Amino acid sequence: MGGLFLGFDTSNYTTSAAIFSEDTGDFILNYKKLLPVAEGERGLRQSEAVFSHIKATGDASEAIRAALNIAGGSSGIRAVACSSSPRSADGSYMPCFLVGEALASSVSGTLGAPLYKVSHQDGHVAVAVYSASRIYSFDADGFFSHPFISFHVSGGTFEVLKVSPSLSSKRIFDV
């Protein structure tokens, strides 16, 4: 029997939470709340993003609770994950990710489920491979066993990435 996997991402523009069911291979929750940017502004300062994420955690928690009630409760959660940095590089840091990391750590500790911290960029790569595997019917796990090139567009960044299988037991791939 599979389980549920709960994930959080608090990027500079969106508060996100998702619950994935290993049994069905589908998401039972895909919660996203765009952070407000004042008209005429180009984006958010980190302090504004952190404050907006903190205000959004109540709605995200309610969406999680409702989804878990339908799924049979929180006992099925096998792991919790969060984006803890923009990229998997030394020194990669943005305060907005601390909100999701704190929420994930709290939920993980309360449920006794392991916590996995990944980068926001890693999340984009993984979900792109997952989505493509659903559309084009290929084995996503096998896909990560060979190097490939990925385009990453997020916020104000555009990068071409070389993604390779990880030699670490804690990671699926390295960028």
Predicted regions and their residues:
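Short acidic/glycine-rich loops and adjacent helix/strand connectors
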Residues: 1-175
